[in-house]
């Protein structure tokens, strides 16, 4: 299940290398531990690792979490990782998410416009791009079984007591940057939330890499 690290786009590499794991509290590490354990069990059993990152509208936090989890897996050399996202309802990926990721080094191309645009999000020159658009967590685009459901907001956690097909349900909630929309702090707070999610997803995959001695 382990492979060599992927070469990411240079600005993303720079962003990741500047992350500070010491900013993660011990309490927060306990929240992340079930995800570490899920990934570890899949690696040990030579199984594919499927993560479905879920929030209410699949518009902000779930997209950031999907993108950074997939990127972290590549950076730390954990193969056969497939990350998805969804919501309890479909809306659209909020434009500030694309702008934030673009600023942090991702290449983003709009491949379909409309009320629910579809984006191709590249983190490495030779890897398939992440396809970003809003959908429900049980959309046909997402896996039907053998996945972990990662709840990235408390309302989705409370509103989805049962997620069909999920092997494991793991709440890892983040504060919504939406509260800063239409304020002078919007750009700063979206970047801040993205960096928090990047830090925590990279920490999770770094634990797997550490166990297997990947440098």
Region locations from a protein language model:
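Short polar/charged helix/loop
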Residues: 2-215
